[in-house]
Amino acid sequence: MVDYIVLGRFQPFHNGHAYLLNRAFEFAGENEVVIAIGSAGKGWESNNPWTLEERKLMIEAWLGSNKKIATIVGIDDINDPPNWVKHASKHHGDGVLVTSDEGTKELYESDNFPVEFVDLANRENLEGWRVRQTLLMLSTVYDDNAVREVLTATVPIPVIDWLIENDAIFRLSTMVAGVNVG
């Protein structure tokens, strides 16, 4: 059996991640999908507003609503790209990486790790920083229906529900004073 691995920070889990995971489940067939959450030790900061546990809960909300099962692991940062694949593999194991990120593809391929590359349509609107900036703009909007209306273009409904039910959007208003790209 071969595991299919999807790696990301999931800050937050958005429609690009959902598309990538759906493709990973297609590739995997009866095999296992492993979701590897990077920057596991980060949380409560502008580029990484949610903790590992919160990101797991977002992903589990999406998985449950789609009747999918996956293993979720966290990976701490080491800030050492040449050694990243070896480090990450200790957490996500061997298998096939499914990615839409060219840099990640090249990093894993340079370490002879099998990769399935997925072209992501509408990538410019589904970058994590854009989704976080939208959430920042909504962080002081208290009309849940308005928040849902705006976010449905980029975030799956179960994740929107989780963010609202857990009051996990407001914190962005306390973290930054302006646009933070990246």
PLM-predicted stretches and their roles:
Residues M1-G182:
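Nucleotidyltransferase catalytic core that binds NTPs
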